Design a protein with these regions (language model features):
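Conserved interaction-surface patches within small, structured recognition/assembly domains
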Residues: 100-106
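A short beta-strand-loop micro-motif that forms or neighbors metal/cofactor-
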Residues: 119-147
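Conserved metal-binding segment of the jelly-roll/cupin
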Residues: 107-122
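Single conserved hydrophobic/aromatic residue that forms the stacking wall/gate
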Residues: 162-174
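N-terminal leader/capping segments at the start of a protein or of a new domain
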Residues: 1-47
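A short glycine-rich, His/Asp/Glu-containing loop-to-beta-strand
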Residues: 38-67
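Betabetaalpha-Me/HNH-type nuclease active-site subdomain
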Residues: 92, 97-100
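Glycine- and acidic-residue-biased ligand/ion/polar-headgroup-sensing regions
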Residues: 72-93
Length: 174
C-alpha cells in the first residue's frame, strides 16, 4: 500500500488546494481596542445562500484512506478544535479521482483550512487524540446537493502517515 507522509501545513505547499490561518495565533496587523485585538478577513470565500457551521467528531483509526469527496461549486472550511488534524487533498480532476496525487498535511489545533472547490478531500483525521472535534464550514445542505463521494479501488488505497516530512518549500503563512 502506498504511504503518504504528512507535511506540516505551509503556504507554498498548500496553495494549490486552498488557504489556511491560525485562529489562535493569527499573524498580521490587528485592529485593537482596550481589551481586544481583531484580525479581520484572514480567510474569505464567496457563498450563494446560507452558510452552515457543523461540528464533526472523527475517531482515530488506521489512517487508510479508501475514498474522497469534492464539491463542484463551493469551498469547504475545517477548523481543528481540540487536536492537531491530518488532512489529505488531491487536485481537481474533472470528477475522476486521482488518489495517486494525494498529499497529506498536518494542521495545528486552532487552525482553519479553506479547501477550494473541486479539490478532493475527506474528513480530517485526529493526530493525537482518540477523537478529533472539528468544525466544518459549508453552505447549508452541501452534503445533500453538492457532494460527490468516490470509493477507491483497493489498489488505490493509501496510508496517511503522521511522521512529518519537511515542507518542500519554505514560506510564511500569509
Amino acid at each position: 500500500m502506498r504511504e503518504v507522509k504528512a507535511v506540516k501545513i505551509n503556504a507554498a505547499d498548500f496553495a494549490p488546494y486552498g488557504t489556511f490561518c491560525s485562529m489562535t495565533e493569527p499573524e498580521g496587523y490587528p485592529l485593537e481596542g482596550e481589551i481586544h485585538k481583531f484580525y479581520p478577513d484572514r480567510i474569505s470565500g464567496t457563498c450563494v445562500g446560507t452558510m452552515a457551521f457543523s461540528p464533526i467528531e472523527v475517531r482515530k483509526d488506521e489512517r487508510i484512506v479508501k475514498m474522497a469527496e469534492y464539491h463542484t461549486t463551493t469551498w469547504e472550511g475545517i477548523v481543528a478544535l481540540d487536536d492537531d488534524m491530518l488532512i489529505h487533498v488531491a487536485p481537481a480532476s474533472g470528477g475522476t479521482p486521482v488518489p495517486e496525487l494525494a498529499k497529506a498535511f498536518l494542521v495545528p489545533k486552532g487552525c482553519m483550512v479553506k479547501i477550494n472547490a473541486a479539490i478532493w478531500h475527506l474528513c480530517p483525521l485526529p493526530a493525537n487524540n482518540e477523537v478529533l472535534h472539528a468544525m466544518i464550514v459549508l453552505p447549508e445542505c452541501t452534503y445533500a446537493n453538492d457532494c460527490t463521494v468516490v470509493e477507491f479501488e483497493e489498489k488505490d488505497w493509501f496510508l496517511s502517515l503522521i511522521h512529518i516530512s519537511e515542507p518542500t518549500r519554505h514560506a510564511q503563512i500569509s
